[in-house]
Amino acid sequence: MRKMKERQSKKAKGFFALDRNNMLLKLKEIQHAVSFSKKFLYNWVKIKANHPSEVDPIFALYLVTKRCNFRCVYCYAESNERISKIAPDDLDFDQNVELLKVIRKDVANLYFSGGEPLLRKDIVDILKACRDLNYHILSLTTNGSLLDKKPEVADYLNYLAISLDTLDEKKNDQLSGVRAGTTKKIIAVTKEFAALQKEKNFTLLVNAVIGEHNIPDIYGLMDFCFEHNIGLSVIGQMENFRPIKYLRTSKEYFKLVEHILDCNAKGYPILGMPQFNKTMLMFEKHTCFPLLIPTIYPNGDLLYPCEVLNKKRYNLLETGSIREAYRRGQKEVGKKLDCPGECYMPAFIVASCFMQQPLSAIKQGIKVKMGNCYNQSVKEDRATIKQVV
């Protein structure tokens, strides 16, 4: 009894011994957790009542620029006519701050993508503005080619993702449409940032797109990520938001997928709960809730209900909030979303799996957040990856 009281006393002292800044951070974490839990419960009730058009967004994907210095052969942003026709005009910094204020009214978690976000000269200032606006979780995806020039982005991020499809430098240069030597630089930068995760308190991820061109290479990429404490996120190559025909019939692909799912189940740092990766990589039909994670375009546009169905377009600087854009969408389009659940946008499948398996999603979130300390048995088991091929 006495020892128990001593332990409780130490825990209490530990919290109150925090300096003012750390204590405020802890309180913000608690506040965010409570707010997120309330929103999840509200959305769960709406979905169970078959009113998916009435949910509140939990995350937003912001394509901060359409400009890109890569020309990836599989990029859906280039191949999809519907996306290419969207106004590509980037907002200036002041307009971005106003847009971020609008987004923050409805969500505390923001994911930056593009295009290539680091092509914006003011990207660091934009991330600083997000912190000033009290965003909770900030993520950014980059091709990595400009990270050495803007390393300070990591100071403001919770998650930094680098796109890399193979360690074969010549092949990756060709797939990315860049000059020779670019991938060599990206791999070196990836290693450098992997070593900074603990110091700067962020999680590094590698995003890989699996296609006919690189299936055998993914095994080596997995080993590279696990060796350097990097989370790995993989998806199949898409065309018009659907998997390419080759992957649907490739035995080599499904053999790789089985291995990825096995590693996921064993606790390797593979991003995504098992159900997400199974749905995403096996192309299983799913129930989609696109309004949970809206996509916002460089000029502030939001497509209702999503970029696939694309029935209405609203500019958030004009509507003043995401909820108002949703309200107008419900009024003009109707509350029925008419989604067949056959596209494979990762954000939509994440939302679907989260709402259907919340405990598993929370467990996965904790695992990713603690991705720098996956267990020793997993480290020792890495050699088995090389034996699969």
Predicted features by range, described:
Residues 61-63, 114, 141, 161, ...:
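Short beta-strand segments
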Residues 230, 242-258, 267-368:
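Accessory C-terminal segments flanking Radical SAM cores
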Residues 81-85, 169-176, 241-246:
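A short acidic, helix-capping loop that chelates divalent metal ions and anchors anionic groups
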Residues 87-91, 177-182, 248-252:
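Alpha-helix N-cap and loop-to-helix initiation/capping positions
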Residues 10-11, 15-150, 158, 365, ...:
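Conserved alpha-helical substructure of the radical SAM core
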Residues 1-54, 299, 311-314, 324, ...:
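Radical SAM enzyme core and accessory elements
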Residues 64, 68, 92, 130, ...:
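Generic structural signal for small/hydrophobic residues in well-ordered secondary structure
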